[in-house]
């Protein structure tokens, strides 16, 4: 199960929070979902080079607040914050409601799965060898403190006639462990040979309750050594 489903959706309410935070009525649910989709699609396309890792949308009775978490917030803010005001007006015009836009910096950009996937995609579009691109991203994630990272690329790799899937794994990525904090990101690289899909899983550690000690696995538990018997 953990190998197939989206690891973020599997852990919602356990160690991950929702990116859309609001309580709808039966009548407002379709409208709110449609507005959230429009906002995210617009911001991801317009601010692609700012390195967006998350877009959080919060609603109250009369207000709508959008928080953009980006690796390069200076590109979004602009001189004296003028670009943020223009962005706010464009989003408000898009959905026909007043919107408050906040910008936050992604402090550990190399440990963000979404940014890692987009980084690999950008390198593939620049004709960098896919193995080199994957290894570079893995090294960056490990330097940022990631406990494990897995990258999968699928498509006509290196211009091959037949599509295939290749993946690299460094450290450990326990997808079945619900207390494991795992970040997940996907991206597409548009190359002359066709589209290449990229998936990234980053394991950032385990979230434990206070006073609960993790059980030792067979690998961590001390192993008993057996003495070899001598023949008579």
Swiss-Prot record:
Residues 211-232 are annotated as: Disordered. Keywords: Ribonucleoprotein, Ribosomal protein, RNA-binding, rRNA-binding. Residues 213-223 have a biased composition (Basic and acidic residues). The keyword Membrane does not apply. GO terms for cellular component: cytosolic small ribosomal subunit. One of its GO terms (molecular function) is structural constituent of ribosome. GO terms for biological process: translation. Residues 39-107 form the KH type-2 domain. It comes from the Bacteria. InterPro entries: KH_dom (IPR004087), KH_dom-like_a/b (IPR015946), KH_dom_type_2 (IPR004044), KH_sf_prok-type (IPR009019), Ribosomal_S3_C_sf (IPR036419), Ribosomal_uS3_bac-typ (IPR005704), Ribosomal_uS3_C (IPR001351), Ribosomal_uS3_CS (IPR018280). Part of the 30S ribosomal subunit. Forms a tight complex with proteins S10 and S14. Binds the lower part of the 30S subunit head. Binds mRNA in the 70S ribosome, positioning it for translation. Belongs to the universal ribosomal protein uS3 family. This is Small ribosomal subunit protein uS3. It comes from Campylobacter concisus (strain 13826). The lineage of its organism: Bacteria, Pseudomonadati, Campylobacterota, Epsilonproteobacteria, Campylobacterales.
């Amino acid at each position: 199960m953990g190998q197939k489903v989206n690891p973020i959706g599997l852990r919602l309410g356990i160690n991950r929070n929702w990116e859309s935070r609001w309580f709808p009525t039966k009548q407002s649910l379709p409208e709110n979902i449609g507005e959230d989709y429009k906002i995210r699609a617009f911001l991801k396309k317009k601010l692609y080079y700012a390195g967006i890792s998350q877009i959080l949308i919060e609603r109250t009775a009369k207000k709508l607040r959008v928080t953009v978490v980006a690796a390069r917030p200076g590109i979004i803010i602009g001189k004296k914050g003028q670009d943020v005001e223009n962005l706010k007006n464009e989003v408000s015009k898009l959905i026909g409601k007043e919107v408050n836009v906040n910008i936050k910096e992604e402090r550990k950009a190399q440990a963000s799965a979404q940014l890692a996937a987009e980084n690999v995609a950008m390198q593939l579009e620049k004709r960098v060898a896919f193995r080199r691109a994957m290894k570079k991203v893995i090294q960056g994630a490990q330097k940022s403190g990631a406990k494990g990272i897995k990258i999968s690329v699928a498509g006509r790799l290196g211009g091959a006639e037949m599509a295939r899937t290749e993946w690299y794994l460094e450290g450990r990525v326990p997808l079945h462990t619900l207390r494991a904090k795992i970040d997940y990101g996907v991206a597409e690289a548009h190359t002359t040979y066709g589209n290449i899909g990229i998936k990234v899983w980053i394991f950032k550690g385990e979230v434990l309750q206070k006073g609960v000690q993790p059980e030792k696995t067979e690998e961590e538990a001390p192993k008993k050594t057996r003495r070899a018997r001598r023949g008579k």
